[in-house]
Amino acid sequence: MAFLLRVVPRLQGPTAWRRPLQGLWCCSGQGDSKRWVGSRSPHSREKSPGTETETFHTIYRFRAIRAIGFLSRLKLAQTAVTVVALPPGFYCYSQGLMTLSSLCLLGGVASFALAMLCWMSHFFRRLVGILYVNESGTLLRVAHLTFWGWRQDTYCAVSDMIPLSESQERVQDVFVRIQQYSGKQTFYLTLRYGRILDRERFAQVFGTLATLKNSK
């Protein structure tokens, strides 16, 4: 995963990802700097009351989330093709057109693909693409991926977020967990490959990075 994070930003030229990922993140203005576009890019939200009128400021962005969303959907399609090939495999085996070892190999590949899909989706659904904070600094909006590789926004109270200074996480690590006191959600962000756009508002939610680096 760390290798992917190093390679993806280098491959992202001005047109490298624009066409195949046209339904992903795109600019839309200051309050909501990223949104979904295109008819094939559903955008779901776990809304909190009153969020429609809130103004949000972007405090963190992980640009490689576009490539990871594409990879998630590609893996989903590959797994579907592998699983769909099982019934024809059983038919060919029953007709004597396939050996038992070939059928077992096909079943093993399908099982491995399913296991990898579950593992990757478990992580990708918790990987943070963008973080927003409202004007009053009381509500955190987390943009992450769904199982299908599309964007989903989750709203969390800032007062429920555990500061990194109170957790056991090391900010120097590739991935850092951000958790809630209520234990409802756990997300992962990468301070090494992501970009903090508003350090002041970020520090209000997660603590000052200089203090965190010196304390770990």
Swiss-Prot record:
Keywords: Membrane, Mitochondrion, Mitochondrion inner membrane, Transmembrane, Transmembrane helix
Segments traversing the membrane: 69-91, 104-124
Single biological process term from Gene Ontology: mitochondrial respiratory chain complex I assembly
Membrane topology: Multi-pass membrane protein
Region (Disordered): 31-52
Task of the protein: As part of the MCIA complex, required for efficient assembly of the mitochondrial complex I.
Subunit-level organization: Part of the mitochondrial complex I assembly/MCIA complex that comprises at least the core subunits TMEM126B, NDUFAF1, ECSIT and ACAD9 and complement subunits such as COA1 and TMEM186. Interacts with MT-ND3.
Name of the protein this chain belongs to: Transmembrane protein 186
Gene, per the UniProt record: Tmem186
